[in-house]
Amino acid sequence: MDTATQTLPVARGAYRLYAEVVPGTGPPVVLMHGFPDNIHLYDRLLPHLAGRRPVVRFDFLGWGRSDKPASYPYTATNQAGDLAAVVGALDERLGTGPLVLVAHDASGPPAIDWALAHPDRVQTLVLLNTYYHWTPTLRRPPAIALYSTPVIRAAARAVVRRRPDLDRRLYTWQVGKFIQDPGERHLLVPQLYKQFQPARPAFWRLNDDLLGAVLARRRRIGDMRRFGPPVRVIFGARDRYLNPHVARNFAALFPHSELHLIDGAGHYVQVDQPQQVADLIAGG
């Protein structure tokens, strides 16, 4: 951990969320990870934001260094509660004020849910290769499709329980496809996989929730059209799944939006182009 980084205690009912804060000035930036990753997704981005804004990053319940209660309902709706707990702890540390919310991948639904409920707290909503509701151009990566499709997901999970080597190879292949730079891929994927193994129950439960979550949130399209704060849509243009069509759909729905398609970046846009992404975030 960097010497400037401070641990932020966050209680989530009886459980504990792991969160870190880097000091700075202005509205705090809240970085949220998706699946199947954790706060280390922002390791390359953080040095480019440090000192420019206060930055908090945290592991959702069930992930990384946060608690992992057994049989917990790990859903997008409950992740919005995780975000609310982090905001509450941040308010106690820094005082209540506007926030820059940064969502990537599966953190799109909880981040947008919270933003729609608390527009007065949002300085800027930043969307990095994420999703919220079903659209015709939204695609699931192969591993996510395997684990989220009813009927076949139970068989797939049974296989990887018996074959941990196959689980590791599938993870390495799929997450590796999200990173453009071979050197960074070689460093980051094993680090993420090490913390993924104990997070697998949360991963599978979120996959169970995935299709219903995106279908249900089509009911929020009207709320998205009425959302007042600025929205900055920053997508890696090489992402085949959460692709430029998804980005353009977000930009069309939110009335005060900017669209930035980053050439040379894929699904992990903050890993592929950290300086450019940090500059766009800090500008909000």
Question: Where would I find each of the regions flagged by the language model?
Answer:
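Alpha/beta-hydrolase fold catalytic core
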Residues: 1-29, 50-53, 87, 92-98, ...
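Flexible "cap/lid" subdomain of the alpha/beta-hydrolase fold that forms the substrate-access gate
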Residues: 3-5, 15-17, 41, 56, ...
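Conserved HGGG/HGGXW glycine-rich cap/lid loop of the alpha/beta-hydrolase fold
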Residues: 21-67
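Conserved acidic functional residues
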Residues: 34, 105, 271-272
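Active-site pre-Tyr helix/loop in NAD(P)-dependent dehydrogenases
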Residues: 35, 131, 256, 268
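Hydrophobic residues on the short alpha-helix immediately C-terminal to a glycine-rich phosphate/catalytic loop
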Residues: 45, 114, 280-284
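Conserved catalytic core of Hanks-type protein kinase domains
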Residues: 48, 253, 271
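Catalytic histidine-centered segment of alpha/beta-hydrolase-like enzymes
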Residues: 265-274
